C-alpha cells in the first residue's frame, strides 16, 4: 500500500514581513526546478507541519508551504489584527512574487480549499490547476451545520463537551458566545473555550476515532490559534459576500481541477463538493468511500492525483 512520500527537509526557509504585525514563515522543498505547488493549509489557524510536504513527489515538484497569519511558525501567534481572507490572498501573491514563480498548482483542503478558490478567482492568470479536498465554501448553512445545529445530532456525546464553556442562556448563538470568550481578557476562559472548539473539530474529523488527530487539536497553542482565528473568520462570514465562491466560478472555469471529498465528511458535508463540481465543468470529483474530513483518510488518493 502506498503511503505518503518519505520525510524531506526544506532546502530554503523564508521569513516574509507583510502587514504589521505579521511575519510569515515560508519554506521550499523538493526540486528547485520542479513544477511549483503551493500547499494551502486548513483552519484557518491550523498551520503546516512536516507531513504537508509529503503529498508530492519531491523529484517532480517545487513544494512551497507557508503558515498563514497568526499560526504555526508565523508571528505573532493567534493574532486577529489585519487577518482576513483577502489579507491571506494578498500574502499568497506576495509569496509567489518573492519566490519568482510565474504560475503554480494550488493544493488545499478544508479551509485550504476556500482560500485556494478565493486566490484563484482573484488571480486566475497565476494558477495552473487546483487540487482541493474537503470542500468548504463558507456559506451560512455550513457554519450553522457544524457550530450550531446539524453535526450535533451525529455526535451528541462530543457536542456536550463542545457546549461546556457556554451557559445555556447563550447557546442560541454559539459562534458569538465562543467569540466573546476567545477574544476576552480572561485567559483561563479563553483557553477553556479554545480547547472545546478545537477538540470538537478534531473528534469529528475522522470516520473512525483517531486519538492522534484529537491530541493534535487539543495541544494548547494549536487549539488557541485554530479557535481564535476560525471563530474570527466565521462570525464575519469569512469576509466573503453571500455565495461568493460559487458565484465567481466562471472566472476560473477554464482551469482544471480535481475535487476529493470523503463520503462521510461530518464537518464539510459532501454536498459542498457536489455544488462546486456542478459549478465547475472542468473539474473532476472523486468521492472517497470510507473517509470523513481529515486528510489522513483520503491521503492515498491525494498522492495518486499529484502524480
Please place each PLM-identified region on the residue numbering:
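Catalytic histidine-centered segment of alpha/beta-hydrolase-like enzymes
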Residues: 291-302
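Conserved acidic catalytic loop of the alpha/beta-hydrolase fold
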Residues: 86-104
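Conserved small/polar residues in nucleotide/adenosyl-binding loops
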Residues: 303-307
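Short beta-strand/loop motif that positions the catalytic acidic residue
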Residues: 259-261
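Conserved alpha/beta-hydrolase "acid-adjacent" motif
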Residues: 266-272
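Conserved hydrolase catalytic core segment
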Residues: 102-141
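Conserved HGGG/HGGXW glycine-rich cap/lid loop of the alpha/beta-hydrolase fold
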Residues: 20-76
Amino acid at each position: 500500500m502506498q503511503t505518503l512520500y518519505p520525510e524531506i527537509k526544506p532546502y530554503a526557509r523564508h521569513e516574509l514581513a507583510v502587514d504589521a504585525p505579521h511575519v510569515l514563515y515560508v519554506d521550499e522543498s523538493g526540486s528547485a526546478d520542479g513544477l511549483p505547488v503551493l500547499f494551502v493549509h486548513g483552519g484557518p489557524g491550523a498551520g503546516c507541519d512536516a507531513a504537508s510536504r509529503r503529498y508530492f513527489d519531491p523529484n517532480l515538484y517545487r513544494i512551497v508551504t507557508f503558515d498563514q497569519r497568526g499560526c504555526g511558525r508565523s508571528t505573532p501567534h493567534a493574532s486577529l489584527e489585519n487577518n482576513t481572507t483577502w489579507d491571506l490572498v494578498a500574502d499568497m501573491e506576495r509569496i509567489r512574487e518573492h519566490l519568482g514563480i510565474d504560475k503554480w498548482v494550488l493544493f488545499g483542503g478544508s479551509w485550504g480549499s476556500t482560500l485556494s478558490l478565493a486566490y484563484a478567482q482573484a488571480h486566475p492568470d497565476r494558477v495552473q490547476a487546483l487540487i482541493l479536498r474537503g470542500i468548504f465554501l463558507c456559506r451560512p448553512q455550513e457554519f450553522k451545520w457544524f457550530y450550531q445545529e446539524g453535526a450535533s445530532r451525529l455526535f451528541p456525546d462530543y457536542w456536550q463537551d463542545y457546549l461546556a464553556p457556554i451557559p445555556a442562556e447563550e447557546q442560541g448563538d454559539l459562534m458569538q458566545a465562543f467569540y466573546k470568550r476567545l477574544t476576552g481578557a480572561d485567559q483561563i476562559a479563553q483557553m477553556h473555550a479554545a480547547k472545546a472548539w478545537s477538540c470538537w473539530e478534531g473528534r469529528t474529523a475522522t470516520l473512525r476515532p483517531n486519538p492522534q488527530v484529537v491530541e493534535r487539536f487539543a495541544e494548547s497553542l494549536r487549539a488557541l490559534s485554530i479557535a481564535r482565528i476560525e471563530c474570527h473568520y466565521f462570525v464575519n462570514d469569512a469576509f466573503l459576500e453571500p455565495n461568493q465562491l460559487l458565484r465567481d466560478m466562471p472566472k476560473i472555469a477554464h482551469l482544471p481541477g480535481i475535487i476529493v471529498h470523503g463520503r462521510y465528511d461530518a464537518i464539510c458535508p459532501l454536498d459542498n463538493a457536489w455544488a462546486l463540481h456542478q459549478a465547475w465543468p472542468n473539474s473532476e470529483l472523486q468521492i472517497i468511500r470510507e473517509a470523513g474530513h481529515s486528510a489522513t483518510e483520503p491521503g492515498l488518493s491525494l498522492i495518486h492525483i499529484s502524480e
